[in-house]
Amino acid sequence: MKKIAIIFGGNSPEYTVSLASATSAIEALQSSPYDYDLSLIGIAPDAMDWYLYTGELENIRQDTWLLDTKHKQKIQPLFEGNGFWLSEEQQTLVPDVLFPIMHGKYGEDGSIQGLFELMKLPYVGCGVAGSALCMNKWLLHQAAAAIGVQSAPTILLTNQANQQEQIEAFIQTHGFPVFFKPNEAGSSKGITKVTCVEEIASALKEAFTYCSAVLLQKNIAGVEIGCGILGNDSLTVGACDAISLVDGFFDFEEKYQLISAKITVPAPLPETIETKVKEQAQLLYRSLGLKGLARIDFFVTERGELYLNEINTMPGFTSHSRYPAMMAAVGLSYQELLQKLLVLAKEEVK
């Protein structure tokens, strides 16, 4: 295994997150002792064009790579193990492994995984079904409930006529604060914490900007705890982390700028709670058929109750992101983590 295609960008609200994650991974792989032959494949934000990019890595980091016309050429995915067609060179590029470092829409929802299945090439991460299920929070919570993992009380809102009545009934039962969340979005995009009736309309509008279905969810007073898992059949469970906030919630700005948030790895949890988090995380991972990697997030209340929040099948992947930090805490360096993911991708097709 030598030829690796790193795939980044795409038509997603998390496009810039993909660029940051991909840049970190590329830097680490370029300096790896395994001497990889890397192909950098960027997908334009409109998702219409794919390019093989051979320019400076800094252009990817700064999102100027598309302007570097001298170092990009259009490519086209091919089916049946034939890799990609290079339009200018009139030849194919056939990587040993595809490594999609894409977040959110089209990157984590099973879309690009389905394409890779048609291409018949090994790829890093979860398959079509696992990716799609984890991206759809409503279905994820139904599946979790079926195996005994609870989530916060939630209803699904679409643009049906009785939407207002549903909202009023939910708030009457559960009170404020509540959260409005796009059913399919990542990095906390489109999520609003609502504390009064006057904030509902704008929160609903914001959430519907990202998805045609919206979750209305009860606030769980507790600490957000993450658990990283690596593997296919044999699993490596990373250290749990804990997120503490001065105010608000862990939104997009907090996730990537850490304005008032503090992330602690390992999380300062009682041993019984830590064990329970890791057991439920592994149960979800195996039951949902996840492969490669995932970060599974819970809320833990003062009484020690666990509530599933979400599952990220391609969590943020810079060298200082939460998932790599969880693995580093159990002795797996960033470079070793990348190598392991590539090996797992090849193992999955044997």
From Swiss-Prot:
Signal peptide: none
Entries under InterPro entries matching the protein: ATP-grasp (IPR011761), ATP_grasp_subdomain_1 (IPR013815), D-Ala_lig_Van_CS (IPR000291), D_ala_D_ala (IPR005905), Dala_Dala_lig_C (IPR011095), Dala_Dala_lig_N (IPR011127), PreATP-grasp_dom_sf (IPR016185)
The protein's annotated pathway: Cell wall biogenesis; peptidoglycan biosynthesis
Annotated phenotype, changing residue 322 to M: Slight increase, of threefold to fourfold, in catalytic efficiency as a D-Ala--D-Ala ligase. Decreases catalytic efficiency as D-Ala--D-Ser ligase by about 10-12-fold
Location of the active site: 14, 187, 321
Annotated positions binding Mg(2+) 2: 310, 312
EC category name: ligase
Pfam families xref list: Dala_Dala_lig_C (PF07478), Dala_Dala_lig_N (PF01820)
Binding site for ATP: 171-226
Catalytic activity: D-serine + D-alanine + ATP = D-alanyl-D-serine + ADP + phosphate + H(+)
Cell location: Cell membrane
Annotated positions binding Mn(2+) 1: 297, 310
Topology versus the membrane: Peripheral membrane protein
GO molecular function: ATP binding; D-alanine-D-alanine ligase activity; metal ion binding
Assembly behavior: Homodimer.
Protein name: Vancomycin C-type resistance protein VanC2
Species assigned in the record: Enterococcus casseliflavus
Gene (name only): vanC2
